[in-house]
Amino acid sequence: MQGPLSAWLVKRRLVHRSLGFDYQGIETLEIKSEDWHSVAVILYVYGYNYLRSQCAYDVAPGGLLASVYHFTRIEYGIDQPEEVCIKVFLARSNPRIPSIFWVWKSADFQERESYDMLGISYDNHPRLKRILMPESWIGWPLRKDYIAPNFYEIQDAH
């Protein structure tokens, strides 16, 4: 079954793949990395003016990584705003995706966290650097193939 956004994108010949609906009935679409920036701008123009969240996950050990976006179309007087989930799957060997910071400023820390934990590089992000781990940290802690170092820093409790 095709949702309203998917139907709208099909009419305009914009490449995407429908992944169905989640348990809340929110439409989920897959967009290719190379199409992501232009589709993001189109979503904003279409009315998705609120980036609810951005996250990322490791699909499988040695497999793809995914950058996930949840958008809401907030309009005055609407009780049930339209929502959509976008997934962009990336090769583990070179996980690069255009940043949407310049479209939704709230993507700033969220993209940095995905970079810090999974190593996804967001092209044209103004401050893409680690946000949770020290700059000297080696590796990407939330990848399923990550091997944790065999040391733990003991902090003074005083």
Curated annotation (Swiss-Prot):
Assigned EC number: 7.1.1.-
Location, primary (coarse class): plastid
InterPro entries: NADH_DH_suC (IPR010218), NADH_quin_OxRdtase_su_C/D-like (IPR037232), NADH_UbQ_OxRdtase_30kDa_su (IPR001268), NADH_UbQ_OxRdtase_CS (IPR020396)
Biological process annotations from GO: photosynthesis, light reaction
Its membrane topology: Peripheral membrane protein
Alphabetic keyword roster: Chloroplast, Membrane, NAD, NADP, Plastid, Plastoquinone, Quinone, Thylakoid, Translocase, Transport
Subcellular location as annotated: Plastid, Chloroplast thylakoid membrane
Annotated Gene Ontology cellular component terms: chloroplast thylakoid membrane
Keyword set includes Protease: no
Disulphide-bonded residues: none
Reaction(s) this enzyme catalyzes, per UniProt: a plastoquinone + NADH + (n+1) H(+)(in) = a plastoquinol + NAD(+) + n H(+)(out); a plastoquinone + NADPH + (n+1) H(+)(in) = a plastoquinol + NADP(+) + n H(+)(out)
PROSITE patterns for this protein: COMPLEX1_30K (PS00542)
Family annotation (NCBIfam families): PRK12494.1
Protein family (similarity comment): Belongs to the complex I 30 kDa subunit family.
Subunit structure: NDH is composed of at least 16 different subunits, 5 of which are encoded in the nucleus.
Stated name of the protein: NAD(P)H-quinone oxidoreductase subunit J, chloroplastic
Annotated source species: Pelargonium hortorum
